[in-house]
Amino acid sequence: MNKVALITGASSGIGMETAKLLVTKGYTVYAAARRVERMQELEKAGVHILKMDVTDEASMVDGVNKILAAENRIDVLVNNAGYGSYGALEEVPLSEARYQFEVNIFGLARLTQLVLPKMREQHSGRIINISSIGGKIGEPHGTWYHATKYAVEGLSDSLRMELKQFGIDVVIIEPGAIKTEWTDIARNNMLKVSGKGPYKNLVEKHARMYERADKSGANPLVVAQTIVDSILADKPKTRYATGGGAKMILFMRRILSDRGFDKLLLGMMK
């Protein structure tokens, strides 16, 4: 019997590439997203498509129930759905900040709650949480986004210890700069929210840095390969930094003081 995986945020980028790759490894793959009209390519590859919004309780419950009704098992959950909306903390509406938490942390946590009873029953399973190097470092104008990713890191580290007794692994993936829609969304929101007020000067420099990073960013397939490697590993690492200078940036964060790293990052914004 094939193992069964659920991947969220699979209508593009990392999620889509992970679904395409994992189905070639003999997994039964369910790819979930809001924009299912963009997922015909996955369907042709043999991936099952689910319409799911990780901010909607009924949508998540229905999706998991459909998988369990069809397969009676779930072996892997890849919590990939994510949202980044940048802007100075002073200027980002709290409604927007809350929405980022709904997508990036509460949706992730709720979907994990929904799959855990079956994984415990199986005494096996793997939860793959897509964090970011932004769960280990901060940037100006990314206060709310980084807060969500720091939360993903803390949640995952605690959950890993809770679930060890049930034979369930928890893995954190920390991508660096990747060529996906995420960068454009974050940059455009940052300019819209904070590109004309008191933060304008640094925001414009930050936006230019993102343009450069987008051109040199890694292909989403690099991260997808790391995710699939973590799924196939007999004993996965607890976290994987991957793509887009991730390992170098995290190394610099470890060796520099807080202010030293601030200086390095601000110096890249020009």
Where do the language-model regions lie?
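Conserved glycine-rich cofactor-binding loop
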Residues: 11-12
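The beta1-alpha1 cofactor-binding region of Rossmann-like NAD(H)/NADP(H)-dependent oxidoreductases
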Residues: 52-62, 94
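A glycine-rich helix->loop->beta "capping" turn
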Residues: 66-79, 85
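Substrate-binding pocket helix/loop in short-chain dehydrogenase/reductase
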Residues: 88-89, 96-98
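Active-site helix of classical SDR
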Residues: 112, 148-151
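Residue(s) in the substrate-gating loop at a strand-loop-helix junction
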Residues: 132
